[in-house]
Amino acid sequence: MPVVHTYCSAPISDGAREALKAAYGKAIAAVPGKSEAWLMCLFEDDAHIYFAGDDSEPCALVDVSVFARSEVPAGAWERFTEEVTPVIARELGVDPARLYIRYDATANFGWNGANF
């Protein structure tokens, strides 16, 4: 049940969405037991985002949530960040210094009318 939610202050083209979806689908395999088969991707563009009090340059926040009953190894998150950062920079025009990626693993995830 991985979910990757991308907020960007700039517009996100259809091509960029496809490229990011593909990158997220590949990178999520860094998390043990996760794959693109259950991945949900959400994209919100033209968001009002300030980074360090400034909204004059594009910036982005990527939220990654996964269903996990045990702790996700820190190395998995590191690998995900390393794999997706250059794609986000290229596709969204966001300087990596203006990008946050936030991770959350939870045992509480619902699907199809029930919780796992």
Predicted regions and their residues:
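Interaction-mediating elements
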Residues: M1-F116
